[in-house]
Every structure is written in C-alpha cells, then in structure tokens.
From Swiss-Prot:
This is Probable endonuclease LCL3. Residues 62-220 form the TNase-like domain. Signal peptide: none annotated. The keyword Metal-binding applies. The active site is at 111, 119, 159. It is found in: Mitochondrion; Membrane. Keywords: Calcium, Endonuclease, Hydrolase, Membrane, Metal-binding, Mitochondrion, Nuclease, Transmembrane, Transmembrane helix. The keyword Protein transport does not apply. Its main location: mitochondrion. One of its GO terms (molecular function) is endonuclease activity. The gene is LCL3. Gene3D superfamilies: 2.40.50.90. The lineage of its organism: Eukaryota, Fungi, Dikarya, Ascomycota, Saccharomycotina. GO terms for cellular component: membrane; mitochondrion.
Length: 233
C-alpha cells in the first residue's frame, strides 16, 4: 500500500456555505424559528397585565381566552389569561391562582365596552338605583367562568376596554349586549374613550328595546338618571 498523500483531486470535497442545499437548510431553520416565535407570542405567551398588551393585540382583531377571577363593579371584572385553555393544561396541569397574593400582577382589569352600569356608592356619593342588581347580575353571569375578550384600548384607569363573550346554554353571548337587553346599563355616553367594536348600532337598538319595555333601570321612568349624568352631578 502506498504511503503517498492523496492528490488534491482525490481529497474529500468541501461544501460552500453558498451551496443551494446549505442556503435552503438555513432558510428552513430561520423560517421555523420565526414561525415558532410568532406562534408563541400569539397563542402561548400569557398577557399578565395591561403592560403586556401590544398594538397588535389592541387592534380589535385578537381574542384572549381566560377566566373571570373577580367581579368588581357592574361593568368590570378581573381576567386571568389562559392561552390555549385546557389544551395547554390550564385547569388540570396548570393551576389558576385563587388567592389575592397569587393573582397579584397576574390579571387584567376589564371594562366592558359600549355599556355603562349604574354607579355604586363611593367617594361619599350614594349608590344609584339598580347598581346592586347590575353587580349581582354580572357576578352570576360571568363570575368564575371562562370568557373570551377582544381588547380595544386602555383607559385612564389602566383598565382594558374590551368586548367580552361567554358561553351559555343558548350559545356564545355578548356580555355588554345582555346587560343592555336586561336594562342593567345604558350605552356608554362619554364623548371620548367610547369603544363599541362594530356593535354600536346593535347596542343602541337593544337599549331602545329595553327602554320601551321598561326593563331594569328603565322602570324608573322620568326619575332615571343615567350613570354619565350621575357622575357629572
């Protein structure tokens, strides 16, 4: 056997980084990484507080799935985001905190879009009629339940103004619409900060129907003071 070294023509060929196969493989890895990052951000990453809400989420096209942990007033509640729901283990592998300390800095305060409920007693002012009924209704309707929210904006109190939908035995229901239907709120009156998505006309028709039927707060007739006017008094 000859001990002479291999000639240059007999050496193993090297593969250039510009070889089409190398470029194709690199593009595949880059694309997979980009897709993974996108899917994680859109479907897996938890939105813990309003600070996690990006412009891409606040465009009215993204929905967040989670659980209502506390109802604070007639038109707002605390929301714990559970991306992926039971498919990603929420409720059986991943526990939702149930204590105030466990939920600290882990929830969104959601303000229902398009609706204003009667004001409860605070800042030395008495409660409006039907404020307690509105609170109890919202607690029974969404309290402890899984809901889907569509965020629109963040208000001056760092609340997420959003559409909320919940599954009931009659199907998926719009929470703001159901409050208006039952006369437990009015269409939001402020000149700024109002959010309706694409439902303003629908909400106004529901309010008018409840008014004609004297449902809830509309049973007060001429004595009714809307929440907006009450806050300005």
């Amino acid at each position: 056997m000859s001990d002479e070294p291999l000639s240059s023509s007999e050496e193993s060929p090297s593969v250039s980084v510009l070889h089409p196969k190398v470029l194709l493989l690199s593009a595949g890895f880059t694309g997979a990484a980009a897709a993974s990052y996108f899917l994680y951000g859109r479907y897996v990453r938890r939105v813990k507080t309003y600070l996690d809400l990006t412009p891409a989420i606040l465009d009215g096209q993204r929905k967040l799935y989670g659980k209502v942990t506390r109802v604070g007033d007639g038109d707002n509640f605390r929301f714990f985001h559970t991306p992926g729901g039971v498919l990603l283990g929420w409720g059986w592998l991943r526990k939702i905190p149930d204590t105030r300390s466990g939920l600290k800095d882990q929830t969104l305060m959601v303000r229902l879009c398009g609706v204003d409920a009667p004001e409860r007693s605070h800042f030395g002012k008495p409660a409006q009629p039907f404020s307690e009924e509105a609170l109890q209704w919202l607690q029974s309707y969404v309290g402890g339940r899984s809901v889907t929210i569509t965020p629109y904006s963040i208000d001056q109190y760092k609340r997420v103004v959003a559409r909320a939908q919940v599954w009931r035995w009659t199907g998926k229901r719009d929470v703001s619409a159901e409050m208006l239907r039952n006369g437990l709120g009015v269409v939001y009156e402020a000149n700024s900060g109002a959010e309706f998505g694409e439902n303003e006309g629908w909400y106004r028709r529901l309010e008018e129907k409840a008014k004609r039927r004297r449902r809830g707060m509309w049973s007060l007739g001429s004595k009714l003071v809307t929440p907006g006017n009450f806050k300005r008094q």
